[in-house]
Swiss-Prot record:
Organism of this sequence: Vitis vinifera
Gene responsible for this protein: CHIT3
Name under which the protein is recorded: Acidic endochitinase
Source organism superkingdom: Eukaryota
InterPro entries from the UniProt entry: Cts1-like, Glyco_hydro18_cat, Glyco_hydro_18_chit_AS, Glycoside_hydrolase_SF, Glycosyl_Hydrlase18_Chitinase
Reaction catalysed by this enzyme: Random endo-hydrolysis of N-acetyl-beta-D-glucosaminide (1->4)-beta-linkages in chitin and chitodextrins
Amino acid sequence: MARTPQSTPLLISLSVLALLQTSYAGGIAIYWGQNGNEGTLTQTCNTGKYSYVNIAFLNKFGNGQTPEINLAGHCNPASNGCTSVSTGIRNCQNRGIKVMLSIGGGAGSYSLSSSNDAQNVANYLWNNFLGGQSSSRPLGDAVLDGIDFDIELGSTLHWDDLARALSRIEFQQERGRKVYLTAAPQCPFPDKVPGTALNTGLFDYVWVQFYNNPPCQYSSGNTNNLLNSWNRWTSSINSTGSFMGLPASSAAAGRGFIPANVLTSQILPVIKRSPKYGGVMLWSKYYDDQSGYSSSIKSSV
């Protein structure tokens, strides 16, 4: 009897090995708007480094307040000086880069007093930054791709109502394109402030801030807390893509900066195995300009 070639176990072993080594490609998200020395939005997107840009911040809204956007030294919205940002938004979108308005931030005055208040804020965001036709659009007539929740202050209530209001089908049908929802929670799980919103499962991208929180950040050569926290977030939150949010330089945050060579050699090879891996988020464009961090990591992201 002829001997049957024993190739099947080898093929299975190779298949298992390939599965274990699967690595997903990602992109870099950047926050722009909080330093007048970081270049224009067009210049930011022309670098070719970024796949997502969050314009930061609409930091006053809700609870009956007149909403206000703060773009630091870039322009003065009080005199309609920020409408020219529309040119940059369109230039970025023409390059395939998604541009979101980030609401909240680490300083400001924002809260939601009720579900009706959340609906009113959603209407304002729609009419002034998304598909609506308000005559008072602070960033001009360009239509942004979505809204980023960077909720770091105040009450935990009604952020889920805001997410649902922004996601309602009538909004999206009206303009025939998707409204992206993104979020930047702090890494302690669950983040108590936007946690109710994240639990809706409506968010497309979640860029968790893995810094300024020692229990869940990189520290002194130790990646354990960081990677354990990453695994908890990616296994618990339903989103299209999970991003590792990092400071772009040691000056960008008090704690949690990861040297580029450590990120590319010890951390990215691990987190890129997750099917939910979306890439890396950096704070911010100004600090990235100073450090060249995105250039150092882009080919590995």
